[in-house]
């Protein structure tokens, strides 16, 4: 009997330590809370178009926006592409392709939409039948989640998307669709 009480106490101590260790392996979304913006960069899909990306995290909601422009100073509006996600959940640390560390995350797709800000943009997408659609219209939001557009398969609404990010002070590198690379586009906290 005298050995049972110390064993019970030791069990509680070990469980308490294990619980604390488990808690440290995940991260809360508060470290991503706020607005993160890139500089004006050449668009990944065209070397004649330019984008400013903005990521806004509020609680477990994440909005990723690409403001597309027709000039290298990003002053002439062309289109806005917006991915809206919910249930953002930050996971454990992972090792990236370059050997550095990042944090894995998952989130759920609410919508993936485009908004043409010029007639030229709407006409170009209609002529190209982008996403299989020829009814893109000026200043009208169009959801293309779940579609394949220009050989890119976009996730459907309610799909779970995985990604990874790396945070260094006020600089953020982030990527969806991969948990081994964060890319090279730098977001700066506003």
List the model feature ranges, each with a label.
Residues 9, 28, 54-56, 80, ...:
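A generic structural signal for short, solvent-exposed coil/turn residues
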Residues 39-48, 63-169, 179-190:
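Contiguous, well-ordered beta-strand patches that form the walls/edges
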Residues 1, 7-12, 29, 42, ...:
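Generic N-terminal initiation segments characterized by hydrophobic and/or small/turn-forming residues
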Residues 20-63:
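Acidic/polar, low-complexity intrinsically disordered N-terminal segments immediately downstream
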Residues 172-173:
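C-terminal amphipathic alpha-helix
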Residues 3-7, 12-36, 190:
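Bacterial Sec-dependent N-terminal signal peptides
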């Amino acid at each position: 009997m005298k050995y049972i009480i110390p064993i019970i106490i030791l069990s509680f101590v070990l469980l308490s330590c294990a619980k604390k260790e488990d808690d440290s392996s995940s991260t809360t979304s508060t470290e991503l809370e706020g607005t993160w913006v890139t500089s004006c960069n050449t668009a990944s899909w065209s070397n004649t178009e330019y984008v400013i990306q903005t990521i806004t995290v509020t609680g477990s909601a994440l909005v990723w926006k690409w403001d597309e422009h027709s000039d290298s100073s990003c002053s002439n509006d062309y289109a806005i592409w917006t991915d809206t996600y919910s249930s953002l959940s930050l996971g454990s640390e992972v090792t990236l392709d370059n050997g550095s560390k990042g944090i894995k995350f998952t989130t759920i797709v609410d919508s993936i939409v485009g908004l043409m800000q010029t007639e030229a943009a709407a006409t170009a997408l209609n002529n190209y039948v982008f996403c299989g659609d020829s009814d893109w219209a000026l200043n009208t939001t169009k959801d293309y989640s779940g579609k394949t557009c220009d050989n890119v398969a976009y996730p459907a609404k309610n799909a779970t998307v995985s990604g990874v990010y790396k945070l260094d002070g006020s600089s953020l590198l982030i990527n969806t669709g991969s948990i081994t690379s964060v890319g090279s586009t730098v977001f700066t906290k506003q």
